[in-house]
Swiss-Prot record:
Keywords: Antiviral defense, Cytoplasm, DNA-binding, Hydrolase, Immunity, Innate immunity, Isopeptide bond, Metal-binding, Methylation, mRNA processing, Nucleus, Phosphoprotein, Repeat, RNA-binding, RNA-mediated gene silencing, Transcription, Transcription regulation, Ubl conjugation, Zinc. The modification Asymmetric dimethylarginine is found at residues 30, 42. Induction: By inflammation. Under normal conditions, long forms starting at Met-1 are dominant. Inflammation causes selective induction of short forms starting at Met-519. There is a cross-link at residues 371, 824 (Glycyl lysine isopeptide (Lys-Gly) (interchain with G-Cter in SUMO2)). This is Double-stranded RNA-specific adenosine deaminase. GO terms for biological process: adenosine to inosine editing; apoptotic process; base conversion or substitution editing; cellular response to virus; defense response to virus; definitive hemopoiesis; erythrocyte differentiation; hematopoietic progenitor cell differentiation.
Length: 1178
């Protein structure tokens, strides 16, 4: 057995006495030491090693004249005896798991006797030494990996799989070790899959970014001739990755607190995304930990909103404002698993490079350093290295021993240790002026308020409060009103000072208004203080501010009170959008050089132009122009309110222009012609309501589910609807709610008409009478300024359809195309809808009827025209030459037929471009709505494909061109599967402009009836539309028109589009249902299945617009007019009997073929050969 331990400098005997009285001299316990300049420090370090290994009973001391080394753990460790060796023989090699940290020391193993007591020496050291040769220390997995990579040589790399096979360590452990060593800066990971791992080159030891501590750079390499220390001091538990998690946790906590300090509150998901994480669960545990520490608190349940506590916010505020040096590292670690932390190391000076070398091995007990806050703010000092706690090396001054034997100033860098500072330096640091001291330069409160005023009012006020180190709260004083129209009153409180409250329909707006009021008062006070006015004049009582909010605002903040945190341009556009008016920013002039331009802008709303303004940029000029327009509008609203209420002032422009008080023509058209969901949400928002959709029920198999949805607007539930998809269910529910809401609330007087009762299904007859029959029931023109002729046509169409569908049916819901024909008795007449229809489908080939019982084409334009024919039949049945004054007819030339009076005109409205040639253009060709008295057409002929005849797709949407060859559809061919061909709506409107709307049968009694105008709501291009509906046939001049016989002509109607809204493209297919109505039907709607051509329902009833029913009307009219020669004819023979019409139709088809547009495709002749029994004259 060896009698001593051979160290690097000599042989030391084993010490058997374990405890000594404190009164003994330290010199009695000095060991024999070799001679040399570094013998004493090396022997002292060896004594530390012997003590930590349990071979010495007492911690060694070092005099003040000598230098000490950093301890293994932070804190002041007192001198105390060690436990018996036999009790801790199994624990000494797992030191980190059994250590218990105290405030004044640490303890291993069983309880220790008090330092002042005496006891017999422990006799376990000899036993430990006697079995010392039998003990061995295995290398840690990290050390094995580093050794293996070192054996490969510098610049050589390998994969994790190879390392796992060679070292016989599981691959997942190898991966963990490799990434841990990479984080510590010891390994380099190359690109590729799998990555190649290699040692970090020695040249990169000092190239790490600032703030990153490389543990290797803090350790000196020992001579290769002394490998004993490396093997003796090995501790497998020291290289575990335990500290990495607390370090990440601390960094996440710091980021969370910093983010919550900048924003008042946030959800867990928002927090995670703003600090670099992805999911809420990544920060949930950290937030709960911070909540236990009293740093954050939460409100709400799903999901909770997190806030900083007031104490934590104050601490962060003080920390940010003082800019003081970072606090020293704590002297004790509260957790048993916490590893020591070392300050960042710096590269040595050039002169010391020869004595310092970076270690290539992972030393025992080495851990990454803790990241200190505000490390970059520490004043720079000389670059020096700190030796590792276990190994020999040159020490430095600054670690002195106190009288009680403690290791003083552990782990505190010299540049942060106030013990060694010069006299008075510590006091100078503590008495450093704060950030808000008047001696430091910073902007004035008035300047800061001016900057904050340009931001959102709430954000600006909070920023100003933070700037002045004040607390700012928004208190909810009162909440009133029903659930569908609540009112919230908020008040701003800054450091206990209360400001005037503000009330609005939402919490957000109320907070903004309250912030605007508080900001205006603070701005006025700060301005008065800067101008030198007495301070008592700048402060106004809260009562005066609350009673006179307009006087409390400075002139410079008047615009802010108008816009409630939004830009002037946005606010103006929103107001005009609510009012249904168009707003335009006009550039009047541009002056000045390129480096200093001047732009002059003005705002034009309808026919009204507001004062121009100039600014150095277009953006600023537009904002200033919008501000001038808003001020002018507010003055007009205030003056009108004074005239009506005797001088009562309105609080804001929004209230004076409340949409529930003033509604315009564009609102109805805009909401009914947009996407149903978007239209309902916009309608609800503009009226101050909240809208939502709720899934009531779900049933049916997975391949054919049924969803029942219900809309809720302003606390009111609307009828439920059923659909086969959730998207369609929401759209149908929105359509139903929108139709009911507008139908109930819309009144004629609110649209500028005389007093008319609300248009509902029950009062439709009276409404139509008031709008069409009574000359005194309505004004001659629409009084709305800015509305165009086409706007009036569109309004009448949608208003009539909305009134008819007030008591909705589920089959009416969803996206649809609307067409209507409006009649005007004279040019000054407002007009009345005489026929309307919806739909976008054609009949299937297997649903054709030989008896005329199906409607072949259910597109909206065709259905409205068939309804118009029924309206003409009803008017003809009422015609009497004695009462012809009230009729729309008059005798034509020759007296044999009737004709439409010259003052009566008919106008067609379609909510979108007609299918076929009229819709074949892209968005860039769309024209804006322009009110023009010129009716001249400018058709577009850009390529030979334009103008071609097209047919509709069977059981679908869209059109395809006809073939050039002759096509004769046959009944049996279609029944056997041949494609059914139906001409497009553009082609049929072209035929109406040549042959008339009345058709062949009515030509027996009437002269041709032509359209006066065509109005579109969407997809309007004047050149493409005019080419499609009339100008195709006159492309080569008047040759075609000259070939027509009297009374047929080529009619060129006036065309235009709606201007009060801009419809957006709606996705999804239209429904198969089709609605038809004419004035003769009262308020009775008929709903068809467009693919079957019959009434929608199980009975498949005959439609009133079918060939059979129209032919029945014709037979009644023949009997009434004593045209018995026509009663015995079939449907096809009666049409051919109209000789003039038949000749003109054949000429029209032949001309289209000759012009190269293609062949007109008709239905099989077999379906026109049905008869009806003669109808007796009633």
């Amino acid at each position: 057995m060896s009698q001593g331990f051979r160290g690097p400098t000599g042989v030391f005997p084993h010490q058997t006495q374990s405890y000594l009285d404190p009164s003994h001299e330290h010199s009695k316990w000095r060991y024999p030491q070799p001679q040399g300049p570094e013998s004493y420090p090396r022997s002292f370090q060896l004594q530390q090693i012997e003590f930590l290994k349990g071979r010495l009973p007492e911690a060694p001391l070092i005099g003040i004249q000598t230098q000490s080394l950093p301890p293994f753990l932070p804190g002041h460790w007192p001198r105390f005896p060690g436990p018996p060796a036999q009790d801790r023989q199994l624990e000494i090699w797992e030191f980190p798991r059994s250590v218990t940290l105290r405030n004044q020391g640490f303890h291993i193993g069983p309880p220790l006797p008090p330092p002042h007591s005496r006891g017999t020496p422990w006799r376990g050291a000899d036993g430990l030494c006697s079995h010392f040769r039998e003990l061995s220390i295995s290398q840690s997995p990290e050390q094995k990996v580093l050794n293996r990579l070192e054996e490969l040589g510098e610049g050589k790399a390998t994969t994790a799989h190879v390392l796992a096979r060679e070292l016989r360590i599981p691959k997942r452990d190898i991966n963990r070790i490799l990434y841990s060593l990479e984080k510590k800066g010891k390994l380099h990971r190359g690109r590729g899959k799998p990555p190649l791992w290699s040692l970090v080159p020695l040249s990169q030891a000092w190239t790490q970014p600032p703030g990153v501590v490389n543990p290797d750079s803090c350790i000196q390499e020992f001579p290769r001739g002394e490998p004993g220390l490396d093997s003796e001091d090995g501790d497998p538990a020291s290289d575990l990755e335990g500290p990495s998690e607390p370090l990440d946790m601390a960094e996440i906590k710091e980021k969370i607190c910093d983010y919550l300090f900048n924003v008042s509150n946030s959800s867990a998901l928002n927090l995670a995304k703003n600090i670099g994480l992805t999911k809420a669960r990544d920060v949930t545990s950290v937030l709960i930990d911070l909540e236990r520490q009293g740093d954050v608190y939460r409100q709400g349940a799903t999901p909770p909103i997190w806030y900083l506590t007031d104490k934590k916010r104050e601490r962060l505020q003080m920390k940010r404002s003082t800019h003081s040096a970072p606090a020293p590292t704590p002297t004790a670690v509260p957790e048993a698993t916490r590893s020591p932390s070392f300050p960042a190391c710096h590269p040595p000076p050039a002169g010391a490079s020869s004595s310092v070398a970076a270690s290539k091995r992972v030393e025992n007990g080495q851990e990454p350093a803790i990241k200190h806050e505000s490390r970059h703010e520490a004043r720079p000092g000389p670059m020096r290295l700190r030796p590792h706690a276990y190994h020999n090396g040159p020490s430095r001054a600054g670690y002195v021993a106190s009288e009680n034997g403690q290791w003083a100033t552990d782990d505190i860098p010299d540049n942060l240790n106030s013990i060694h500072t010069a006299p008075g330096e510590f006091r100078a640091i503590m008495e450093m002026p704060s950030f808000y001291s008047p001696t430091l330069p910073r902007c004035s409160p008035y300047k800061k308020l001016t900057e904050c005023q340009l931001k959102n009012p709430v954000s600006g006020l909070l920023e100003y409060a933070q700037f002045t180190s004040q607390t700012c709260d928004f208190n909810l004083i009162e909440q009133s009103g029903p659930s569908h129209e609540p009112r919230f009153k908020f008040q701003v409180v800054i450091n206990g000072r209360e400001f005037p409250p503000a009330e609005a329909g939402s919490k957000k707006v109320a907070k903004q208004d309250a912030a605007v009021k508080a900001m205006a008062i603070l701005l006025r006070e700060a301005k008065a203080k800067d101008s030198g006015q007495p301070e008592d004049l700048s402060h106004c009582p809260m009562e005066e501010d609350s009673e006179k909010p307009a006087e409390a605002q400075a002139p410079s903040s008047s615009a802010t009170s108008l816009f409630s945190g939004k830009s002037p341009v946005t606010t103006l556009l929103e107001c005009m959008h609510k009012l249904g008016n168009s707003c335009e920013f006009r550039l009047l002039s541009k002056e000045g050089p390129a480096h200093d331009p001047k732009f002059q802008y003005c705002v034009a709303v309808g026919a009204q132009t507001f004062p121009p303004v100039s600014a150095p940029s277009k953006k600023v000029a537009k904002q200033m122009a919008a501000e001038e327009a808003m001020k002018a509008l507010q003055e007009e609203a205030a003056s009108s309110a004074d005239d009506q209420s005797g001088g009562a002032n309105t609080d804001s422009l929004d209230e004076s222009m409340a949409p529930n008080k003033i509604r315009r023509i564009g609102e109805l058209v805009r909401y009914l012609n947009t996407n149903p969901v978007g239209g309902l949400l916009e309608y609800a928002r503009s009226h101050g309501f909240a809208a939502e959709f709720k899934l009531i029920d779900q049933s049916g198999p997975p391949h054919e589910p049924k969803f029942v949805y219900q809309a809720k607007v302003g606390g009111r539930w609307f009828p439920a609807v059923c659909a086969h998809s959730k998207k369609q269910g929401k759209q149908d529910a929105a359509d139903a709610a929108l139709r009911v809401l507008i139908g109930e609330s819309e009144k004629a007087e609110q649209l500028g008409f005389a007093e008319v009762t609300p248009v509902t299904g029950a009062s439709l007859r009276r409404t139509m009478l008031l709008l069409s029959r009574s000359p005194d029931a309505h004004p001659k023109t629409l009084p709305l300024s800015g509305s165009t002729f086409h706007d009036q046509i569109a309004m009448l169409s949608h208003r009539c359809f909305n009134a008819l569908t007030n008591s909705f049916q589920p089959s009416l819901l969803g996206r649809k195309i609307l067409a209507a024909i409006i009649m005007k008795r004279d040019p000054e007449d407002m007009g009345v809808v005489v026929s309307l229809g919806t739909g976008n489908r054609c009949v299937k080939g297997d649903s054709l009827s030989l008896k005329g019982e199906t409607v072949n084409d259910c597109h909206a334009e065709i259905i409205s025209r068939r309804g118009f024919i029924r309206f003409l039949y009803s008017e003809l049945m009422k015609y009497n030459h004695h009462t012809a004054k009230n009729s729309i007819f008059e005798l034509a030339r020759g007296g044999e037929k009737l004709q439409i009076k010259k003052t009566v005109s008919f106008h067609l409205y379609i909510s979108t471009a007609p299918c076929g040639d009229g819709a074949l253009f892209d968005k860039s060709c769309s024209d804006r709505a322009v009110e023009s008295t010129e009716s001249r057409h400018y058709p577009v002929f850009e390529n030979p494909k334009q103008g071609k005849l097209r047919t509709k797709v069977e059981n679908g949407e869209g059109t395809i061109p006809v073939e050039s060859s002759d096509i004769v559809p046959t009944w049996d061919g279609i029944r056997l599967g041949e494609r059914l061909r139906t001409m497009s709506c553009s082609d049929k409107i072209l035929r109406w402009n040549v042959l008339g709307l009345q058709g062949a049968l009515l030509t027996h009694f009437l002269q041709p009836v032509y359209l006066k105008s065509v109005t579109l709501g969407y997809l309007f291009s004047q050149g493409h539309l005019t080419r499609a509906i009339c100008c195709r046939v006159t492309r080569d001049g008047k040759a075609f028109e000259d070939g027509l016989r009297y009374p047929f002509i080529v009619n060129h109607p006036k065309v235009g589009r709606v201007s009060v809204y801009d419809s957006k493209r709606q996705s999804g297919k239209t429904k198969e249902t089709s609605v038809n109505w004419c004035m003769a039907d009262g308020y009775d709607l008929e709903i068809l299945d467009g693919t079957r051509g019959t009434v929608d329902g199980p009975g498949k009833e005959l439609s009133r617009v079918s060939k059979k029913n129209i032919f029945l009307q014709f037979k009644k009219l023949c009997s009434f007019r004593a045209r018995r020669d026509l009663l015995q004819l079939s449907y096809g023979e009666a049409k051919k009997a109209a000789r003039d019409y038949d000749l003109a139709k054949n000429y029209f088809k032949k001309s289209l073929r000759d012009m190269g547009y293609g062949n007109w495709i008709s239905k099989p002749q077999e379906e026109k050969n049905f008869y009806l029994c003669p109808v007796p004259n009633d």
